């Protein structure tokens, strides 16, 4: 009897040990954001309303028709007059970009952001175990990742990934790479650098679908420190809860809706097709189908299913009520309350229409979409790094409290929709905001005035006649 008791005691002890080891090992696989640093270019790269006019008027390929189109586009874009452009635009060389222009633009970003991030956290570049760099429209040899390693003299065994061509959703792809590495390697520190090089891709032709990108995309970038070190968990800002990636590259319509291309004159630019909203909506819906059960409580999912069931029964009884009679392109509401599982919504700043569309679909109010709106207004569409400017706005406004969940939603060429949820590890209301990119202007947002500076300065163009129009002397 004593032997039997001893046997079962040992067996139970072994089982408890295995369970403890399993739980303990999972803790080492968690992905935390330790800190992040958004890039604020120097003020001499700020695109004022006046300078926007100078850029447009010196393009000899444009006429009054294109001016009217651009005015309408920039007014409806939601962008303000304090965004940043590449340095070569201010030097008047946008028609003759060089490889060095693109590299210099990226060097200015990573020297600033990575340098500040490592210094603030008292981390040596040699402590970095994993480096992931994503810049879609610049591919150099050696890679940008290699240039960062060379500049900061990182270790020989650092694991390196250099992503190109992944579009505006690339930063979450970079985070996903880090997350998967953390599953296999414990006690690691990762650095993600996300940006976009606009210098080689500033379009100087007159194709409307390509010149539209000049109105939306602006310079920016972000460096993010991630870790699965147990000793750093209490210092972390966010913990990754889940991530879902959707790729519709197999669909021709989605694949071709936004693409880097040449126009008929051979000028390189970024094409934004009219079917882009449709492709984005389709990818977003597919993504939501997968991530929703992962992030919302069971009670809300049951309520939603019952609501759908009742609706289907009513439609069967009266088919005429099943028609929505909505105009084409109108975003549909998901019909589910995402606020039951999410406190904050970090939306990609692809444009005013993108933000409004997601806000409508998820039934968000003005408070929810304010961070994305203000980021678009202040910094423009900074491509893959835009999500982090939105997150920084929330932090600067002291919205992020311990236990809150942040839903990140991004879109990118391919066509891709990537989303993830972060849990706030501790109240973010104090010293961690020292390097926040919004610190210098957060009290000015939201702005009291809603007047559009572009409409005020260039609204007269709409009344001009092609036969009598003349470029004002102020822009010659």
Swiss-Prot record:
Keywords: Acyltransferase, Endoplasmic reticulum, Signal, Transferase. Residues 1-25 form the signal peptide. Residues 26-313 form the FAE domain. This is 3-ketoacyl-CoA synthase 12. The active site is at 168, 247, 344, 348, 377, 381. The keyword Transmembrane helix does not apply. GO terms for molecular function: fatty acid elongase activity. It is an enzyme of class 2 (transferase). Belongs to the thiolase-like superfamily. Chalcone/stilbene synthases family. The keyword Signal applies. InterPro entries: 3-ktacl-CoA_syn, ACP_syn_III_C, FAE1_typ3_polyketide_synth, Thiolase-like. Pathway: Lipid metabolism; fatty acid biosynthesis. Gene3D superfamilies: 3.40.47.10.
